[in-house]
């Protein structure tokens, strides 16, 4: 089986034995996006990867191909909800877990201009329409559907709101490509993302990827299974499941976190066994879920290098003298480090991207002193935000920079993300560490539907490469 990830910068391939799950080889090539004149094809880079693999493994030339893609801008999703703090926020989380980049979140208070911009300037690939709990208010999602149409939207819509309004909403949007799924927030404090996540994947394959004009060859759409972040998150879920049942782990696993440092964004995927308090309404109206993905659009190695420097400087992670390096990388996204000094600059930008992205995903825990009691003592309350990752057992580093920097440098970056935080950041405290330098997680996500046993074995092989953090 030949598993392919068409990325925005690199096309990565992994050749896997479909019976045993053994990784036979991997190769990468710059992603070949077609030019404005129509020349070139995204499959040119793939052909180069397959030819390279076939030199050592002749069966690669005829292997079955499964692919995912974030090339050409990936999957852009706009969320339309009712209450910003409930259904709109729930929709945003579902969109992220579906592998999309959220480009707009509209709610009841959004004005007419925002809906006009949706069709004219924002131009998402898919609109996710939510609103209302089951048995609750039906007007919100119906109004959202009307406002989408009034703004001139004619693209795909996934409806995942109050089930009582599905027929009316379906009638309103009947002329659009539409899929109606179960409510993502059936009741307050409950988030059910899976049905909508599957519908968004189907929309991506049926209506989105072909419109990006990445290839003129029919085999491109035939090999695609979904958006890259969606398949990677699926791979992380498989990895977490295997760790829980793997006797070699020696104990019950509490979770997995993956930090993926890209050129434009830094993504964090987590699958964590939740504390019962966290699964309910103790902190959030929209419940925390075991499977979470966050995307930081201002953190990255190239296109977002300057905003990474700004964020890193604000948090005391980067110095002023790194700014010229960040400016150069943002202006030249194809830049590759050639000297020790340039590699050291990449290391600093990567470490800042990963650290800040992980902090935003995990949040922090801190003691808040309240009002004095009758006895004269002040009450003390632990205030927590984000998702508690402190007991996570495995921390995985991914992304081109961690593959291309020297191994010891990549390990140093990953090691810096763990440990007890004096500032209360809920980062992994004592995890094992592993670098995904062979594109394994995307391959696991691609394989699991067709070859579940091979996917599980491949995931286990990655976990068994884990190391203990340096002291």
Predicted regions and their residues:
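Long, internal scaffold/assembly segments composed of regular secondary structure
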Residues: 225-311
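A glycine- and small/hydrophobic-rich beta-loop-beta segment
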Residues: 308-373
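Short glycine-rich, Thr/Ser-proximal phosphate-binding strand/loop in the N-terminal lobe
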Residues: 10-40, 97-101, 281-305
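Asp-based phosphoryl-transfer active-site loop
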Residues: 2-12, 70, 260-266, 395-398
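Nucleotide/phosphate-binding catalytic cleft detector across ATP-hydrolyzing
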Residues: 1-3, 20, 29-35, 40-255, ...
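Short acidic-glycine loop/turn motifs at beta-strand connectors
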Residues: 17-20, 272-275, 406
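Short acidic (Asp/Glu) and glycine-rich catalytic loops that position anionic groups and cofactors
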Residues: 23-26, 292, 298, 328-336, ...
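Short, compositionally biased low-complexity segments
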Residues: 14, 18-21, 25, 205-209, ...
């Amino acid at each position: 089986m030949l598993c392919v990830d068409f990325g925005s910068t690199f096309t990565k391939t992994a050749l896997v034995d479909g019976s045993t799950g053994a990784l036979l080889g991997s190769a990468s090539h710059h992603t070949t996006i077609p030019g404005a004149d129509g020349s070139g094809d995204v499959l040119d880079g793939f052909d180069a990867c397959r030819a390279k693999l076939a030199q050592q493994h002749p069966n690669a030339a005829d292997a079955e191909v499964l692919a995912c893609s974030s090339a050409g801008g990936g999957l852009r999703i706009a969320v339309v909800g009712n209450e910003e703090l409930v259904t709109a926020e729930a929709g945003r989380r579902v969109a992220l877990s579906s592998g999309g980049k959220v480009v707009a979140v509209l709610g009841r208070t959004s004005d007419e201009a925002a809906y006009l911009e949706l069709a004219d300037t924002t131009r998402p690939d898919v609109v996710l329409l939510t609103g209302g709990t089951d048995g609750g208010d039906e007007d919100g999602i119906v109004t959202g559907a009307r406002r989408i149409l009034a703004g001139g939207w004619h693209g795909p819509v996934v409806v995942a709101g109050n089930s009582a309004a599905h027929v009316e909403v379906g009638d309103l949007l009947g002329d659009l490509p539409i899929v109606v799924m179960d409510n993502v927030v059936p009741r307050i404090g409950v988030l059910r993302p899976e049905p909508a996540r599957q519908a968004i994947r189907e929309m991506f394959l049926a209506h989105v990827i072909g419109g990006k004009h990445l290839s003129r060859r029919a085999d491109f759409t035939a090999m695609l299974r979904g958006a890259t972040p969606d398949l990677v998150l699926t791979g992380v879920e498989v990895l977490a499941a295997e760790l829980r049942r793997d006797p070699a782990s020696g104990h019950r696993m509490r979770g997995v976190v993956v930090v993926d440092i890209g050129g434009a964004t830094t993504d964090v995927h987590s699958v964590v066994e939740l504390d019962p308090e966290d699964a309910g309404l103790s902190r959030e109206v929209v419940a925390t879920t075991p499977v979470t993905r966050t995307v930081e659009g201002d953190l990255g190695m190239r296109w977002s290098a300057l905003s990474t420097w700004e964020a890193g400087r604000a948090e005391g992670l980067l110095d002023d003298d790194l700014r010229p390096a960040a400016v150069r990388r943002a202006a030249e996204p194809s830049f590759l480090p050639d000297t020790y000094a340039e590699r050291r600059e990449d290391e600093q930008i990567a470490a800042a991207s990963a650290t800040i992205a992980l902090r935003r995903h995990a949040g922090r825990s801190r003691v808040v002193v309240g009002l004095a009691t009758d006895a004269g003592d002040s009450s003390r309350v632990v205030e927590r935000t984000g998702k508690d990752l402190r007991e996570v057992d495995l921390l995985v580093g991914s992304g081109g920079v961690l593959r291309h920097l020297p191994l010891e440098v990549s390990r140093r970056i990953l090691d810096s993300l763990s440990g007890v935080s004096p500032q209360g950041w809920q980062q992994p405290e004592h995890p094992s560490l592993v670098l995904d330098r062979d594109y394994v997680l995307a391959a696991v996500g691609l394989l699991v539907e067709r070859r579940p046993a091979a996917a599980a074995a491949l995931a286990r092989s990655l976990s068994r490469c884990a190391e203990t953090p340096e002291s």
